[in-house]
């Protein structure tokens, strides 16, 4: 038998679950059930109907056992897609947003689509970085709840983003991440050239960076957690000990041990012991 952890989006007594199950209510919104894979498959429609997220573990993990968390930034740590917001402020929003959505769904080559979107920034003042941070970008609700749980366990945390380094640096400092890694747009005379410089932070880079950081810290891959939402996060999710899909695109869900559809960071630590 495996351990099924159920987290509801609102307070509940879990009375909607079959009486045949031995349900152990842990908090006002979470419960644990010992069940088989087939039981879990049968429960999925019921849990979806009651706006519950759930994860099945052979052995339920302890949060204290994890020493490194790698998080995507756009639509994972923050609510927005940074380049979409920058493009909107620069007057090319609709064009760029459509390409971003297809790239995150895995329908387009990531590098080609990113370079095409970055090209639309040519000639735009680089002060747009500061403007988008102040005027547009919003942190995901209850992010600090999750980060505080990590702090209690002295867990290292890093941001790995296909976004841009100055924006990542802002959130690294604001939320006390250990480090942040992202792409860089070339700037000349205070304006974007429409090109990228340095190593591309794509899907394979994200996985390599997680693995390299763990190695440098003497942490086993089994002691890592990765959190992401888009197709470019899949290799990173596959590398980690526990993969979390944060309101993920459909292509991401099969690779996630925990999928947050109905809940968010206020609930993530409830899946662990």
Please place each PLM-identified region on the residue numbering.
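C-terminal cap/substrate-recognition subdomain and adjoining C-terminal extension
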Residues: 128-273
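Active-site neighborhood of HAD-like aspartate-dependent phosphohydrolases
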Residues: 61-108
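Short coil/turn segments at secondary-structure boundaries
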Residues: 98-102, 114, 146
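Long, charge-rich alpha-helical interaction segments
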Residues: 116-121, 138
């Amino acid at each position: 038998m495996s351990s099924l952890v159920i987290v509801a989006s609102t307070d509940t007594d879990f009375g909607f679950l079959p009486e045949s199950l031995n349900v152990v209510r842990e908090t006002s919104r979470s419960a644990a059930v010992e069940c088989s894979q087939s039981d879990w498959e049968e429960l999925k429609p019921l849990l979806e109907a009651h706006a519950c997220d759930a994860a099945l573990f052979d052995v339920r993990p302890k949060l204290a056992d994890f020493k490194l968390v790698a998080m995507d930034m756009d639509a994972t740590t923050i609510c927005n897609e940074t380049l979409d917001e920058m493009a909107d402020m620069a007057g090319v929003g609709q064009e760029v947003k459509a390409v971003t959505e297809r790239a995150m769904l895995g329908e387009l080559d990531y590098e080609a689509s990113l370079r095409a979107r970055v090209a639309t920034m040519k000639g735009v003042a680089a002060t747009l970085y500061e403007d988008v941070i102040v005027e547009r970008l919003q942190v995901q609700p209850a992010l600090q709840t999750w980060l505080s749980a990590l702090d209690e366990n002295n867990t290292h945390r890093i941001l790995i983003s296909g976004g841009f380094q100055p924006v990542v640096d802002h959130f690294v400092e604001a939320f006390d991440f250990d480090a942040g890694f992202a792409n860089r747009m070339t700037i000349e005379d205070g304006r974007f050239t429409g090109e990228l410089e340095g190593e591309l932070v794509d899907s394979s880079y994200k996985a390599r960076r997680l693995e390299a950081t763990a190695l440098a810290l003497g942490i086993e891959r089994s002691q890592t957690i990765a959190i992401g939402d888009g197709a470019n996060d899949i290799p990173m999710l596959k590398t980690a000990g526990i993969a979390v899909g944060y309101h993920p695109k459909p292509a991401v869900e099969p690779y996630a041990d925990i999928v947050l559809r109905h809940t968010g960071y206020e609930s993530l630590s409830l899946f662990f012991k």
